[in-house]
A protein has these predicted regions:
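Class I S-adenosyl-L-methionine-dependent methyltransferase catalytic core
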Residues: 1-184
């Protein structure tokens, strides 16, 4: 795994192989991550990354949020509950020297504390496939999102977004279905 673009382009991130089934890690491949950022930056959404406040739910290794920081996001918050994933996430933040621009929360992504003072403008949602956790996490964090914020959701089947969210695009990359939503 590596950072695909931006200021830290080419930076090698901590290795996890093809994923750790026991730790429920399924990192977004470089190819899919590149496609996601091409879609975000060239899909008619302006540039939702530059200057943005990013929330990476079910963050795993943090590759999506860190990619956003490399491409100009101002801040990234990561939510992860797994011990192995948290260790990799913290290591990757250190490799990027991004400690000052990040916050890491160890908690269940389906439960949200009160919203931060600065609303999130871009949310990455990459839950374990087929468990309905994405729907619950997005509903729990809806109050964190700025009006019109983009949500990029990875699943293996079409997700059911909470009421008020508008689906803008959906693309399949192998087993991964990427859905872009707009917050109300």
């Amino acid at each position: 795994m590596r950072i695909i673009g931006g200021q830290r382009r080419g930076l090698k991130l901590a290795e996890v192989g093809d994923g750790d089934a026991r730790a429920h890690l399924r990192p977004t491949s470089d190819r899919v991550r590149e496609a996601i950022f091409n879609l975000l930056l060239n899909g008619g959404y302006g540039n939702p990354v530059a200057g943005g406040h990013v929330l990476d739910l079910f963050a795993g290794t943090g590759a999506l949020g860190l990619e956003a920081l490399s491409r100009g996001a101002q801040r990234a918050s990561f939510v992860e509950n797994g011990t192995a994933a948290l260790a990799l996430l913290r290591r990757n933040i250190a490799l990027m020297r991004a400690e000052a621009a990040t916050a890491v929360e160890r908690r269940d992504a389906t439960q949200a504390p009160p919203a931060p003072a600065t609303p999130v403008t871009l949310c990455f949602l990459d839950p374990p496939y087929g468990k309905g956790l994405g729907e619950r996490a997005l509903a729990a964090h809806a109050g964190w999102l700025a009006p019109g914020a983009l949500v990029l959701w990875e699943e293996n089947i079409a997700p059911v977004p909470p009421e008020g969210f508008t689906q803008l695009d959906q693309r399949r990359y192998g087993d991964t279905l990427v859905t872009i939503l707009e917050a109300p």
